[in-house]
Amino acid sequence: MTSSVSLSICGDVERPVRLAAAELRSLMDAELVADFHCREGWSRFDERWRGVRLRTLLAYAGAADDAGYVTVGSGEYTAVLTRAQADDDRVLLALDHEGAESPRPSGFPRLVGPAEWDCFLSVKSVDRIEVTRQPQQATAETIALARLER
């Protein structure tokens, strides 16, 4: 992951933060092995990811307990998770894939989760996490489906 990575955590948090790549790495606390199923009809099995649990990042910024939604974004691409989804042990911001540090051009940091997730929730090149009391506008599914129609 390159030094140009910068992730902001904002919204209903005690301490809005901006984390650089080295700071994200220092928080790494999880590994996930999960299948990935794309709506295009292909799958990858037993993908190994290492990174920071999303709930760890939320705690680091002091996310409000009554904020029920987490928006994860990369530019105009946004996925909205419920707080329960975000707090799941299997949801992380991946920094490594298959044992190798992954650079930003490959989509890192990347939101990854359990195999039952819709593929469009796997946001690549995450640049912000926003904690809110009300759900924000999610664009992930619309953008992903438009790409499939090409």
Region roles according to the model:
Residues 1-29, 60-150:
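Extended, aromatic/histidine-rich regions of cofactor-dependent oxidoreductases associated
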Residues 25-39:
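Solvent-exposed edge beta-strands and adjacent loop segments
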